[in-house]
Amino acid sequence: MKHVRRYFLLLAIICVTGVMLTRPQVRHLAGQASESLQSYYVSARADAVNEKGFTLSYNGTLLDIENMRMSSGMNLLIPLSDVVRYFGASVTVGEKGECFVQGQYLENAAFVDERMPERIMIDMTAAAPALGLEYRWDDGARAASLDVQQNQELPGYFDLRETRALNRVENQGTFGTCWAFASTAALETVLSGDETLDFSVDHMTMNSGFNIGPAEGGDYNMALAYLASWRGPVLEENDPYGDGMTDGSLTAVKHLQEARFLDERNLEQIKAMILRYGGVESSLYMSIENAWDSSEDYAPGTASYYYAGGEKPNHDVVIIGWDDDYSRENFSHAPENNGAFLCRNSWGEEFGDGGYFYVSYEDSNLGNNSVIYTRLDETDNYDGIYQSDLLGWVGTLGYKEPSAWFSNVYTAEADEILKAVSFYAVDDHTTWELYAVPDYSGMESLAQPVYLGSGYFENGGYYTVDIPEMLSLSAGSRFAVMVRITTENSERPIAIEYPASDLTAGADLSDGEGYISYDGNQWVSAETEYGCNLCLKAFTVNKESLYE
């Protein structure tokens, strides 16, 4: 950045490794220098730590942050750009150097690195509590750690509209496009800083690849497949809603690289994710069909809804806040306890309170199936994407046990560097090991892969793992990416795409070359033996762009 402006930054967890060197030269962006000088011993210790290098782990996983440093006072300093990438929080740095983390003002927590004036450093020792993290330093091991605090207290009330501007609530009309309205709206809430974009619903519904019309419904898995494949999002102004037309040549204005599936009925987790990232997309059963409809479950006077029956969900919304003290008496038939989520609908501003309404914590469906988009990158994050699963996660494959191996083979389109790999965790508590074969010459090549790293995903979801190594790929050469995955309580831990029904009849098995294995030694073709593509993408940067 050439000028420091007020902005919010949304961050995502990445599991990689690294070593950092040299002491930083920094100055405060604003404020008076400390009156008490740091002792010579502490300053000398910081020099020694920076010269020898140290490690940082997040919840037990080593991170790769190249320009991380210790200050002369032995405080952990991390570049703001890496805080964006790795930690998942809202950070604002003002024009005068004021720093707000999760809405909390932190004095002298933002610095300019004088070796590189455009680089802003954040004091993570000071910022950790505001992020719900506990910071520790092990001097003997030269190891810093940041771990999620247990039992972090959440506020009793939160409304995302009070912390950032949201687009006006639109009306889906008679179409069954609530899923796309909810997905695009949820995505808009995780944009960084004061950035406000209006994403196209039409483009998502008409370019999803699924065999479905606008009058039919969908779900967030369809939206995720569209976003993860970089077909979108595009701007509403370039593909407006409801005109029956779309432009398939439009390119994405953001790149989605991560989404997490939240635990069923874990209300505290939903709250924590809203506070940390933005809106949570979820589903519920609506016994009304539009803003002018009525039922015993909806109280229009208080814009309150509570359904206690056994019907399955038929509508998607975005949860943007909550009120633990929201009175049970506000509902047309009272639940047992107070408390409700604040939800954004897609029935226009005529519905509820300007398009928003409260749903009781005790609603039968809300919170059972929820997703949050946790890493939304700029479009220059990578140069290339290699994939064969345009419909995303349709089913699962495995060997009736938690572990399995899977690999996809691609052909490099240019002289490139392999920078990242993405795949799904089909359930919570997933560990993984990542490998690659840079010069693939046949199935036997899979027996000698290059180890790239390992990590852990607490939640099911779609994840991108960045690769610190400079793994070179030659134009026209074939390469393979490989994952050993272990998911607790799963007998089929591999996410696959296949023509399971009319909805997914468009799955193209001719564009993929995937292999699965029980032990990493004996491999079989996913397409030939199982009639599926593997959900395993690769991302590259062009070699020439590294030196521009």
Task: Specify the residue positions occupied by each region the protein language model found.
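N-terminal secretory signal peptides that target proteins for export/translocation
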Residues: 1-2
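Extracellular interaction modules
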Residues: 115-119, 138-145, 365-368, 475, ...
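Short, surface-exposed tryptophan/glycine-enriched loops
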Residues: 268-274, 463-478
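Short beta-strand segments enriched for Tyr within beta-sheet-rich domains
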Residues: 421, 477-483
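Catalytic-core signature of thiol
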Residues: 149-419, 424-459, 492-498
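Surface-exposed coil/turn segments at beta-strand junctions on protein surfaces, enriched
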Residues: 71-73, 115-117, 275, 336, ...
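Primary recognition of N-terminal secretory signal peptides and signal-anchoring hydrophobic helices
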Residues: 5-8, 18-156
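Short, surface-exposed beta-strand/loop patches at domain edges
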Residues: 484-548
